[in-house]
Amino acid sequence: MEQEIKSLLYELGIPVIQREKIVAPNCVSIHYDLVKIEHLAQVEKKVKFLSAYLHKDIVYQKSEIAHFSLRLPREDDKFVKFYDEEYDYIFNKKLTKDRDIFMGVDNNNVPRVFNLDDMPHILIAGTTGSGKSVMLNNIICCLLRNAKKECRPSFTMIDTKRVELSMYRNLPDCDIATTAEQAVELLEGVCYRLESRYAMMESQGIRKISSDYFRHIVVIEELGDLMMATNGAVEKYIVKIAQLGRACGVHLIVATQHPVVRVITGAIKANISCRIALQVTSGIDSRNILGHNGAEKLKGKGDCLLKLPDKANEIHLQCPLVTDSDITRAINAFIGG
């Protein structure tokens, strides 16, 4: 394919020298040097022709003055496994801090690790088959797998589907709600926990808890169902947790198949700045989660865009595939640790 692209560019009057080819789990990036720098302005104009001619969704990226790259989708997507020999070193070398999360592999085939402290609340959206639940399990399993014994987190989980988070029911210090009524009760309890922590901080004269203070993680598997079942009554609890949780070590991880305005309200969106967009059904859904189109063009099965707080551009990732046996291993490591 790269030779065909090089030949087509030459026929279009843009001779290039191929610098390198990077094969990532969900795409191939081919980097070129221009023979003549004045041809750079022409390249972007010709990419649409290349895409149509090759029947590929080719993305043009300008980098250095006389250098550019073209990104093509892979013919055969590669899954990134949670426990994978190729990326196993991540748990031994890269995940060195408590709350480090292996979010996936980027377009340069680089494993990307981020800390929950830098993205204290996370909003995940994706349609059926997009990998939404897998990404949610990946985040939970990373937190379990990498937890330090002296400051292991506690959990509040809301699973109105009753089965998605059922494997975590035997975790120590983990409450799971399976009905809307239980969910409201647990979220109200988390808000009391917030007040208690703030009272402790006030009495000690501190504005933010230390990094080694144990965290509480609130996981909502499907916000859409919960908002519908409670007629939006849970919104005030979610917003309060998002507004006050960061300073006192309470984190919120919310997922939904329905990233519409009545589910991801303005107040919720304004207070959860880290977003993970997997494949969604429309540009409208993409705009509600990311602020622009793009997520509707993702391929599903873990293909995602990660928007970090205070960062303008998203990171394109292939998230790890987490199996039931991976979840069991992570739980055992957490309990045994």
Go through each PLM region and give its residues.
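P-loop NTPase catalytic phosphate-binding loop
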Residues: 4-18, 26-45, 49-53, 62-71, ...
